[in-house]
Amino acid sequence: GGGAVFFYFNHSARSNSYATMHDMHHGKSGGASQGMMQGHMHDEMTMPGLQGKDTTDTEVADLKRIFQQHMEIERRVTNLPNGISTFTASNTPEVREAIVSHVSMMVTRLAEGKNPEVIIQSPTLDALFDVHEEIETEIEVTDTGVNVFQTSSNPEVVKLLQTHAAEVSDMSERGMAAVHERMSQ
């Protein structure tokens, strides 16, 4: 079996480059286009970068809520010799529901090897989808969120799981600022 801790965002090697998407959002793509943002700050309300190859409206809505209300999320990660243990929660019912929904959908996607290829998705997540059959996942829904345990017998997969967990923690702490910083590197 396989699964995913949480959905993680950054540039996918299978999608347009971040620079191209960033320029398009800010009207720097040339020609008659004014860009989707017409010179404004990143669109924190519609978040067009959350769309993927086959993402559902529910998946995108969950991600928007998680990003827009990231300050209401509590997250703890423990690196294990063979993987990770994470706790992600919120005392805000709508945020908790988005977290649980998102984790459940991503665990299913990873088990099926069905990479959503979200525009701002992490290369780490792409790599995890490539090795999804080497990941064991257990989830436990709590009153405020979800515990996730992911393990692998492959040390390289363990490193990917730990990297992904750290990236998700950064996003839960800093929101889209973490994504934009990572994508501009």
Question: Where do the PLM segments sit?
Answer:
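Intrinsically disordered, low-complexity terminal tails/loops enriched in metal-binding residues
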Residues: 1-185
